[in-house]
């Protein structure tokens, strides 16, 4: 009796994983973001690949592991950040994202770490310039060039429900991997 339910559960989890993978390919980007670069690379287990960022302004890095598990470390004080020395980091088992503030000194060092649990990790990193305007602390939008405040774009942080959905997908995919690993 358990075999039909196991098959149905595996089918359900597999379909969720496929729809999750399709959603990653079609990730939503806020209106004020401009894609600057797409970088693909590989990094061995326990090693780092280093990149250098020279673009000014607020930059957003979005990285996803194509294979294995790659983590992201960022620093404006060293060009070789690591898990011991960094200012910003994202070390998740899924998509990694870091917002680099405009005040960071350039060049900014970016370290991509290949987690030891995988022999090799492949990653794709998208580099965005964030041109959205943040509200001024006193209610007025801060414009460096003095343009009309009526033309401002509201700054909206990512929707919390979207973040919760992402965590749910990560958990479901992890469960699917575990079940498949146990069965095969």
Curated annotation (Swiss-Prot):
Glycosylation site positions: 47
Q: Which cellular compartments is it found in?
A: Secreted
Keywords associated with the record: Apoptosis, Glycoprotein, Secreted, Signal
Name the domain of life.
Eukaryota
- Annotated GO biological process: apoptotic process
Q: Which InterPro entries match?
A: UPF0669 (IPR031420)
Family affiliation: Belongs to the UPF0669 family.
Q: What is this protein called?
A: UPF0669 protein C6orf120 homolog
């Amino acid at each position: 009796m358990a075999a039909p339910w196991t098959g149905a559960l595996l089918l359900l989890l597999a379909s969720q994983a496929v729809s999750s993978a399709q959603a990653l390919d079609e990730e939503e980007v806020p209106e004020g973001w401009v894609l600057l670069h797409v970088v693909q690379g590989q990094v061995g287990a326990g090693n780092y690949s280093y990149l250098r960022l020279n673009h000014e302004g607020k930059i957003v890095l979005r990285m996803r592991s194509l294979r294995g598990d790659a983590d992201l470390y960022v620093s404006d004080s060293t060009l070789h950040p690591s898990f011991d020395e960094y200012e910003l980091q994202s070390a998740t088992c899924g998509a990694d994202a870091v917002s680099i503030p405009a005040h960071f000194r350039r060049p900014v060092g970016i370290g991509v770490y290949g987690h030891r649990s995988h022999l090799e990790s492949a990653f794709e990193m998208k580099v965005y310039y964030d041109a959205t305007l943040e509200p001024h602390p006193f209610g007025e939008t801060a414009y460096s060039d003095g343009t009309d405040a009526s033309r401002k774009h509201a700054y909206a942080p990512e929707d919390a429900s979207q973040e919760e959905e992402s965590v749910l997908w990560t958990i479901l995919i992890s469960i699917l991997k575990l079940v498949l690993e146990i069965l095969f």
